[in-house]
Amino acid sequence: RLLRSLMNVRFPGPALNGYMELQDELLTEEAQEKGLVKVEELPTAAEEFGIGQVRNADRMSLWRGDITRLQADAIVNAANSQLLGCFVPCHGCIDNAIHSAAGIQLRNACAELMEEQGHEEPTGKAKITPGYNLPAAHVIHTVGPIVGLKVTEKQKEELKSCYVSCLKLAEKEGLKNIVFCCISTGEFHFPNKLAAEIAVDTADRFLTGSKLERVVFNVFKEEDYNIYKKLFKKALL
């Protein structure tokens, strides 16, 4: 926890000689202890729940657990507009978990992207970096909408744009699979059920005509698992 806290508060920049090797060794060991989960070995939603309204359920999966265990071509990080990860020590957000498991190289890579861009990351776009010490080869970063008292139509479109941007980027990079976290539902307060509906519908439409082989929806809470499960089990009218 001490190392994670120090990583979380550390600003981007070069590390002391020997640090990277020690950090990488420790994070690799931690990843092995947590246990790796291969995306291609996950059952499809069609196998688990049958084929209902989701046409491409045979190319989607639902998995509950720690996203930093997944061996995938890319996992999606629900980032903030600075794109530098969470600076709160040991915070429970997905941004913190992914940066902590990847190592300080991820923040450094994001800082380079942001310096090159010259402004904050807009909502609904996507950027890609290596995964560094994660089992995932890449991290795709996207900034979801922040909801106030009520979800607006603009925010619904922005969330949809997050998914489309990530899917397009994955396809452009020649990736075969992508793992989505629940974008905007945590710290950004997007209603869970509506967010899941947008996620599944957007991915389903995109997969028709796409070369992507698998889209995985990763959830951590039982509430979210049940929401996605109901969407996949929803029968055709």
Pin down the residues of each PLM region.
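Macrodomain-like recognition of ADP-ribose-binding/processing modules
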Residues: 1-237
